[in-house]
Amino acid sequence: MISNKRKEIDTINEHHEKNNDDSDGIDNGLLTYKKFKKDFESGSTNYRELQIIAKSLGLASNGKKQLVYNRIEGYFLSKKVKNNLTNNETNRQVEKKKEQQQPQPQEKQYILTFKDVEPVEIYFWKIFRNIVIFKHIFSNFKSKQYSYYDLIGCDEILLNGKSNSMEIIIDNIKSYNHQIIRNESNIIDIINKFKKNDEKTRSFYNLLFSRYSSTSTSPSTQLPSTIQFDGNIDIWIQRMIENVNYTALDQFIKFFKIDSEVIKKAIKIHIDPSFFGNTTYDKLKIYNYLKSINSIPTSHTLLSTISINFSTLLSFDNKFKKLIKSYKRLIESTNLQEQQEQLEKQGIIKIHPNKKYYEKLNQKILELNEIQTSQFTNYQLNSTIKKLLNHTTPTSTSTSTSTSTSTYTSTSTSTSTSLKTTNLTIISTESNYSSTNNNNNNINLKEIIKKYYKSIYLFIYFTINSANKTIFRKPLLYYLYFKKERVDKMYEHVIKKWNGSNFDHKLFFQRIFKDIKIEKNEKFELISNVLNNKYVKTFKLKDLHIFFEAVFSSNDIELIDYFLKILKQQQLNQTPETTTFPVIGSLISDYCHFIDKKEILDFYFQNYRDECLLFNDQNQTWKRIQLGLIEHYEYLTGSIGNRCNFDIFRWFDSSKFLDRLNRTIAKPLLYYFDFRGTINFNFNFIFKGLIDSNTEDSKENSIIHFLSNAQLKHPLYVSPILESSFNRYKSKMLTFIKFLFNNISKESIETKLKVINLKTDNKNFEEINSEIVLTTTLTTTTTTTTTTTTGTTATATNLLSAKKGEDVGFFIIGQTESFNFTVSIRILLVCLYRLDRVDDIIYLFDKLPEVLFNPDYFSIFTKEHCLYGISSSYYLELFINYFIENLNNNTINYLYNCLCIASKKGYTQIFKNIISSDHNSKYLLKIRTKSNQSSLFSSKLLNDIVVKSINSLNFELSNLLIDFIDFSEKDKNTLKMKIIKSK
């Protein structure tokens, strides 16, 4: 065997000599990489043969077998890469000669030859290379118009409002556009946002550190000198720790190769010792990391300051794997076992006040050390603890659920439900289910979860002062899940141990009635005891609401039925000494918003129709029924000939108003409109509030649906409606704006603006005097806007009943061909801008300067949400140039306002372009004096422009303006000092 290998090796060497050692040995007769790898994996190549091959290739032959193999494999792969590069170049030259020799075809077909290209990418390149299609598609992108990146910078709105915010920042950094990150505050927001520990985030931070450091290769004219990570190492360590960002801290330390002593010093100076003591899951991760690189000062030892936030670290809503990690991080971070051993050696443990906790904890740690995470299935690790302990996926208990005793062990129980049962044992396969617990290899999962919780609680009891033990009371859920007592006994413990607070009452009843699997008879007994005043000394009247809510929200028909029957019996036997309970009809109506399935509605309809208000004629209760059940509710109510009452002034949940209003319009035979006593003036105010609440949920189609099927008697005042949508935190309402201005031309707007009343004697001119009425014409497409109300989609046309034309006060039911709306000039221009109709704006500027640049209107256009305030740098510069070209006593104010906005937003390039123009810079950015009357602005006005850039922390722009504008030395020094104080 070895002799054969030698022959193959000799052949390799000869081949290498002939080919300048550039071959990878793939040809016939050679020891090829493929054959070499196959022989090794099959076990036919022994250690001695590997050494011979390595020596023949000039490689080291010492070390373990796998190490020698890796060297040889690396040799083959490096040869292959080199040959591929050489061969590719040779092949390209050969192909080029062939192409020159052959006649060129008239039309060349491009074919992708890569084998690993995704199918979608192939389509992309086909489109990319088709000039006609490419231009059509990319003409829809309005990056110059919006340019939200330079408009808002890297603040919390960008970070939290855009799912691709990291990619946006990366693109801007790579293109050396540092407008996206203007100051250290932006970077702190980034550190607070991007914490995921994956390759993408790690690469992002490495890019960030490389560009914002003293060694950066970024052009000096672009890099903001105020941001350099390596200039304040200790401060950035502090910020990353306090923002609990493990990924940023880890990459920061590695990138700048920070010594552990430097980290210790930074922590000692800038981090309070109690910071890590107030333990959270992520803080433990950072603490253990710093401990692993020997960077925790002795003053910050965790054990001496530790306290635990039970509500987050040990929540039963956490995944099982998080509980395991929390336990390990807590035990590892404190060196608990080492400290225990030291105490034991010193004999201190014998007199330790918490000795009993130490012994129990030590036993639990030994038991948990025997358990490996690999023993659990992925399903178990990624399930919540509550879900695993409840045996079933949290859901409402159905009427067919068996009332046999529920089990807390892994023994499978037979129920008549089809609910998904989780595996409660550790098993050797990946199955999520188990039907037996007799196998010795199976371990009860509930007991393991309990051990983890128990160990953490014992750890706390062992490490804290005995006087503070009452602070670390085990949470109520731990008691409910792990104590094997009857429900009535559990409730007594709630009263005694947890003082029976409202929160504990609510938690107890919700878990007992809805989540925890307990024998149904015990739940019945608890209901009976509460209603029979067994707990009268502890159960207060204010707790009744909590109790009723828990019963009705369970959506368990058996439970609700039993509750209502006992309550009815109590009311029949009621005496002055007993608790007075609400009548059944009121209770059902008050808690009907908890109904989440049709069966509950049917139950009330069949058994309590006459007692409750739910199905009465012209009732208001229907508004509380969940939208997903409203169609079934309508069917039940209509089946007995009753109608629902729609009273706009008694509506309490405006976020659901439009969906319900559209239903009433669609089914006027089932709903009765009660708009009596209202006046038309109030409708705009009411409708604005309803629109505001619906824009947050992006329900613009609901708004359009209503306006398409209700003939308004008076123009709709849209300015305040759209005003609220211009807030950066809200939806832009582009769909609604397109709907309004769909068929309104610039000529029709011009006509309306011409007749506007420009005369006013009011010095404090109000915007209400600058409004116009426009008419929207609805097309067939518009009037059939789809809306989703009950889970099924239908068009507005199909939803309408045959009964149309009903006058309901504010409007007349029925499809409308057009409607009028009132809009202010300021909002009009903003809407045109949003619709990318800037050419129309310029058209109106040219046609109606006396209207749009009227001095009385100037205050309107200094607001934040005006045309110039929302413009991107591209369009703001366009407006600035327009005012320069059309300069007069009116436009000069608008020009100055735009320059102030550009300064505040840090649009540095606008000012660079002005400076580069000798003509513009002389009268825009030079001080107007007696000797220089060609300049437009005084020293104070130009000073204010600079101050706005300083206040916005745009120091690059500030320095640019200070250096160029001819301020006095005193004014320059004052401005520079202001920059220093702002840093």
Curated annotation (Swiss-Prot):
List each copy of the SAP domain by range. Answer: 42-76
Q: Bias category Basic and acidic residues: which stretches?
A: 1-21
GO molecular-function term, one example from the UniProt record: DNA binding
Keywords on record? DNA-binding
Q: Which domain of life is it from?
A: Eukaryota
List where Low complexity composition bias occurs. 392-413
Using the UniProt annotation, give all residue ranges assigned to the region (Disordered).
Answer: 1-26, 391-413
The record, for PANTHER family, names: UPF0746 PROTEIN DDB_G0280785-RELATED
Spell out the family assignment given in the record's similarity comment. Belongs to the UPF0746 family.
Protein name (Swiss-Prot/TrEMBL):
UPF0746 protein DDB_G0280809
Which species expresses this protein natively? Dictyostelium discoideum (Social amoeba)
Q: What is the lineage of its organism?
A: Eukaryota, Amoebozoa, Evosea, Eumycetozoa, Dictyostelia
